[in-house]
């Protein structure tokens, strides 16, 4: 099946439902399209939207913001280096927030070490890095280690102003 543009997909939806734009308004059609795209993105992690974000942990701070427009976090690496995201590193294990709070319940300096675990909480609107959620780390970092977040990004959806997307071109039958 060939891919869709915004215009061809909205026409196909109207033809399938046998109603015109007086009943099936652009607002309703756009919501159908958005829901279908999000379902595809959640169910099929696409290489086209794999992203990485690199930064430095803050000594004594056990949270970091998830990058803006994150659909979900695939993994977190912490490097033993404080200056480069290369070399020796550890993949953090995802756990529930309650596990992390029991594992090391304190952020005091004697309990700090290179993190081993992370948990997701809060946010989840995906609009900015302060509303995309937060990662809780345990134990709390004892140094400014370099970290890399591997995540699936939320792409710009199909719309009247964005007439084609990777999903509309290669997963048209899912829409």
Residue ranges and their predicted role:
Residues 1-175:
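Glycine-enriched, solvent-exposed interface loops adjoining structured elements
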């Amino acid at each position: 099946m060939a891919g869709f543009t915004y215009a061809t997909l909205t026409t196909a939806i109207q033809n399938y439902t046998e109603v015109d734009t007086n009943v099936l308004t652009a607002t309703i059609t756009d919501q159908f399209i958005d829901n279908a795209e999000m379902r595809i993105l959640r169910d099929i992690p696409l290489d086209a939207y794999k992203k990485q974000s690199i930064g430095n942990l803050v000594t004594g701070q056990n949270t970091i913001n998830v990058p803006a427009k994150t659909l979900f976090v695939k993994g977190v690496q912490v490097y033993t280096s404080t200056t480069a995201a290369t070399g020796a590193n550890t993949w953090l294990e995802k756990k529930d927030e309650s596990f992390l709070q029991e594992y090391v319940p304190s952020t005091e300096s004697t309990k700090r070490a290179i993190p081993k675990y992370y948990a997701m909480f809060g946010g989840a609107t995906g609009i900015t890095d302060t509303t995309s959620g937060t990662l809780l780390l345990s134990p709390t970092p004892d140094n400014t280690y370099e970290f890399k977040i591997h995540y699936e990004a939320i792409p710009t959806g199909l719309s009247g102003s964005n007439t084609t997307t990777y999903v509309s071109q290669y997963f048209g039958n899912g829409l």
